[in-house]
Amino acid sequence: MKCLCFIVLLAIVIAQSYVGVEAAPSDGFVSRNGVQFILNGKPFYANGFNAYWLAYEATDPTTRFKITNVFQNATSLGLTIARTWGFRDGAIYRALQTAPGSYDEQTFQGLDFVIAEAKRIGIKLIILLVNNWDDYGGKKQYVDWARSKGEVVSSNDDFYRNPVIKDFYKNHVKTVLNRVNTFTKVAYKDEPAIMAWQLMNEPRCGVDKSGKTLMDWINEMAPFVKSVDPNHLLSTGHEGFYGDSSPERKNSLNPVSANTVGADFIANHNIDAIDFASMHCGSDLWFQRLDQNSRLAFIKRWLEGHIEDAQNILKKPVILAEFGLGSDTPRYTLANRDGVFTTTYDIIYASAQKGGSAAGALFWEVISEGMSNFAGPSSIILSDKSSTVNIISEHARKMGLLGETTRK
């Protein structure tokens, strides 16, 4: 009996490890026309979520079912996009890039699986190429690598200026984009299941508050990414903080602390190689002490300002790539979280309904069942029958109907 149970278990593990090998019916690349995304000649809306952990869990074949569950639950609710990490740098468990130019093949196959499974189930991916923060390596790891090779660096923001570090980043871009998926046999740069790349998660450069250093880096790296991969859309990974190019917005919309981070929402997105604008709305992080009414008022001003600027100045789509309300926020209630989701979605829908620049919203964050080790204050399990999940599903339904109406 024990032997039979072991054989059955082994068969399940093997089956799970090969989920996603069969490709779904062919699907096109997401492109853009003015302020709208286009898929197979029709308008496309980015309704989705963040799940940074996908490649990490997919590195172990016995836990790949978690990726399958999340994608299946997402599509059952009408969600279309998952935003996830395409990096994990340094001497950490399940690192992707263990040293400059050195990659762990098992971890890379985890990312292969995520892409293959997204393709099979019908999810588009937005993949980030490095982190601003120290988590999972980030720009600090790149700077440490350079220092170990004798480079004179004084801060983590030398990531943007040091030529050796910039070459490390470019090599990572080439390695990831040219990677041939071991499941689908398709190079990432040729894979339609990938919607877009983002240069960095939440780029900031505090040592140069003028914004010039970060702007120079984007001006160099965005065309470089496009030279390697002209098929996919590209954005910055920006939080949406305004800079010196729009002083009125900077003074009226930015959290005060954001005025020193060297980012510029308008300038950083106003180049040809950047296809769409990115913003986040971390009202729970930026304004811990706001009451609910004040929080919702800020969200309205923040989103409507960026949507207006994407429409009239950038003339590109804008994605709200992170939003939510953490349970660790002072005076948190589920009703308050639902209020944040409802207000956010209503503003996105109002723009999309008019053919405006708001192309979708991705909440932070989704986890799968049984992932208590990854659970955070903002984690949502899509299979839960919570009021928040109902709001997510209803918004996806409305945006889907809007897309169908627009296509006629």
From Swiss-Prot:
Question: Which GO biological-process labels does this protein carry?
Answer: polysaccharide catabolic process
Similarity comment: family membership: Belongs to the glycosyl hydrolase 5 (cellulase A) family.
Keywords carried by this UniProt record: Glycoprotein, Glycosidase, Hydrolase, Secreted, Signal
Kindly identify the residues recorded as the active site: 202 (proton donor), 322 (nucleophile)
Q: Which reaction does it catalyse?
A: Random hydrolysis of (1->4)-beta-D-mannosidic linkages in mannans, galactomannans and glucomannans
Q: Which organism is it from?
A: Arabidopsis thaliana (Mouse-ear cress)
The record's annotation in SUPFAM superfamilies points to: (Trans)glycosidases
Q: Which InterPro entries match?
A: Glyco_hydro_5 (IPR001547), Glycoside_hydrolase_SF (IPR017853), MAN-like (IPR045053)
List the molecular function annotations (GO) for this entry.
mannan endo-1,4-beta-mannosidase activity
A GO cellular component entry from the record: extracellular region
Top-rank taxon, per record: Eukaryota
Cell membrane recorded as keyword: no
Q: Which residues form the signal peptide?
A: 1-23
Q: Does the keyword Glycoprotein apply?
A: yes
Glycosylated residues, per the record, are 73
* UniProt name for this protein: Putative mannan endo-1,4-beta-mannosidase 4
Chief subcellular site? secreted
Q: What EC number(s) does its UniProt record assign? A: 3.2.1.78
